[in-house]
Regions:
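Extracytoplasmic ligand-binding site segments that recognize negatively charged/polar headgroups
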Residues: 1-123
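A ligand-binding cleft/hinge motif common to bilobed small-molecule-binding domains
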Residues: 1-4, 119, 123-144
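Periplasmic-binding protein-like
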Residues: 23-24, 37, 65-74, 97-101, 107-108, 179-203, ...
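Alpha-helix capping/helix-boundary segments
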Residues: 114, 132-133, 185
């Protein structure tokens, strides 16, 4: 977010935010949040009766557990896992990545590449979101997918929208951003983007049994902008 803001391409929207359901606060004068979720490892309950209950448990698990994750250089979830590991382990993150390597089946460019491998049975767990099982419950009437609830806590993703300074009709852009916080927009987020709305909205059946992390992690945009390059380099070296 800080990198995007520093380009100077985006204008302050001047709107009063209605995002009262975020698990952690963010500055919203330029970028307006419209949905959010927690990163998590999803598994098939019919194949894995007892999933790891923490990042530590996953890292120290037997090598016959295989996970599919995404590349932090090309994927939002991949970057989310990088920040999650850094939030939990700090300076020890590189060592933890090295310990995790034997469990990593593959690192894909994008979310769907990894998730499809998981659905095909190639991986035991896949990096996704705590809300991913809701799709299977609601759209497919399948109840055998779940997100592992990790004791350390889960990293948050907040999706944002903004208006360009060069927008030919800035008032229409501002009106659309305002519309994104209205009930008509927010109410369809759970069953279209399969994430949580940012305003108080009745959630559909299928969301009520999802994992609710006891602790949330979220670096500030400035922290990510300052450290992202070095943290990715650390991940690359640890993955060799």
């Amino acid at each position: 977010m800080a990198v995007a803001q520093n380009t100077g391409l985006f204008a302050e929207h001047g709107l009063k935010s209605g995002a009262n359901m975020l698990p952690l606060p963010i500055e919203e004068n330029v970028f307006l949040p419209f949905d959010w979720g927690y990163f998590a490892f999803v598994y098939d309950t019919s194949k894995m009766a007892t999933p790891p209950a923490s990042l530590d448990a996953l890292i120290s698990a037997k090598e016959d557990i295989k996970i599919a994750i995404q590349d932090p250089r090309t994927s939002t979830p991949g970057l989310g896992l990088l920040l999650w590991m850094k939030s939990v382990y700090g300076d020890d993150a590189a060592a933890k990545w090295q310990q995790l390597q034997p469990k990593i089946l593959t690192v894909t460019k994008g979310w769907w590449d990894a998730y499809s491998l998981f659905l095909e049975g190639e991986a035991d767990m896949v990096l996704s979101y705590t809300t991913s099982p809701a799709y299977h419950i609601i759209a497919e009437n399948k109840n055998n997918y779940a997100a592992a609830d990790f004791a350390e806590g889960h990293y948050v993703q907040i999706e944002l929208a903004a208006m360009l300074k060069s927008a030919p009709q800035p008032e229409l852009a501002r009106q659309f951003l305002s519309f994104m916080h209205q009930q008509g927009f927010q109410s369809v987020i759970p069953t279209t983007n399969w994430m949580y709305p940012v305003t108080k909205t009745k959630l559909p059946e299928g969301f009520d049994g999802l994992v609710q992390p006891a602790k949330s992690f979220l670096f500030s945009p400035d922290e990510v902008a300052k450290n992202q390059k070095n943290w990715i380099s650390e991940w690359v070296q640890s993955s060799k």
